[in-house]
Structure formats: C-alpha cells, structure tokens
Amino acid sequence: MLVAIEGIDGAGKTTLARSLALKLRGVGLETVVSKEPTNGPWGMLLRQSAATGRFSPEEEVDVLLRDRRQHVEDLIVPMIGRGAVVILDRYFPSMVAYQGAAGLPVDALLEANAFAPRPDVLLLLDVPPAIGLQRIWERGSTPNHFETTENLSRCRDIFLALELPSKRVIDATANAETVLSAALALVMEVLRVRLGALGAVVLRRLAG
C-alpha cells in the first residue's frame, strides 16, 4: 500500500508521516517512511539547488526524475511487493506543483511521471501560504527561494486542481492530532478493502 503526503512547505507533512507510521506499526503493519527528494546522490543535488537556486526548472525536473526512478526501483516497488505500507513525505505531485508554479506545463509534468506508481491514498494537507511560512519560521528555519507567499500560492492552487483519483484534502490548519485523526480515517478506508478479514482486526486495533 502506498500513501503519499503532499502540501506546500509548512503544511505538516513530515509530522504526519511520522505519526501515521507509529500508528500503523503499533497494530503490527510493516511500515516504511521515505521522502522526496531522497538522501541519494540525485536528491542531495536537488537540496543544494533548493538552497541556492542554481538549477533551472528544466534542470530540476531532470534531476527529480532521476531521483524518483531510483526511489521507485530501489525502495517503493520492492517494499510494496512484500506487503509493507510505504508512506512518502512528498512524491511526484510536488514536482508537478512546484515546477508547474515555475511555468512548466502541468500536463507534461504528469506525463513525465507516468512510470511512478500511483498512491492508494494521496493526502493533501492544505494550508494558506501565510500559515505555512509562519510554521517554517517557528521551527527555526529560513525560507528558501521557493518559499515565498506568491510561489506557495501558485503551488497550492496546482495541488488543489490536480485531478488524481486517490487525492483527499485535509484542512491542515488544525492541530497535529486532528490532522492525524483525519488521515488515519482515510487510510483505514483503503485498509478495509486491501486486507479483507485481516483488515477488520487491524481496523479495530486502530480505532481503539
């Protein structure tokens, strides 16, 4: 099962990914948390670009796709194949939103990611840019060149407009516990179908 957590910077993706994984592991489900960009060589290049603005949008797309292909081949597909729940802190919709906000065609970006497995659940944590930026400052970070009100507004609009069948929007202006409860309810819907009789046992544990 593949769960992707998306949203603009400061939406609470990393917090939710960790909390959700703890819940699922607590009921005996093998759960892996990963992120994009990854910590691999391509991902490190992307982080350097995010800090310095060195790459053009087209160059970033090329490196993002290289990073994602390696991620899919080395972790996502193998872990799903063994029955684990994979939780991703960002996935291909982030590339579509951020590079789309930089002026690249959204349809072409989606097509370039056709190789990437589609999430069973895509949790879009929605917050206004002002709140996202406030949270970035509160955690002691300095916003990078992507993290401006104007750019995050464009990214948010693209995230909300994306037509992906598994997308579910969560109001992430709420506290972390409320967001986790909403996310868990959506994940449980898929688990109920995926796990059958075993799912009933797991769901009772999660509900407890």
Curated annotation (Swiss-Prot):
It comes from the Bacteria. Keywords: ATP-binding, Kinase, Nucleotide biosynthesis, Nucleotide-binding, Transferase. The keyword Membrane does not apply. It catalyses: dTMP + ATP = dTDP + ADP. The keyword Nucleotide-binding applies. GO terms for molecular function: ATP binding; dTMP kinase activity. It is an enzyme of class 2 (transferase). Its EC number is 2.7.4.9. Pfam families: Thymidylate_kin. One of its GO terms (biological process) is dTDP biosynthetic process. GO terms for cellular component: cytosol. ATP binds at residues 7-14. Belongs to the thymidylate kinase family. PANTHER family: THYMIDYLATE KINASE (PTHR10344), UMP-CMP KINASE 2, MITOCHONDRIAL (PTHR10344:SF4). Phosphorylation of dTMP to form dTDP in both de novo and salvage pathways of dTTP synthesis. This is Thymidylate kinase. It comes from Xylella fastidiosa (strain 9a5c). The gene is tmk.
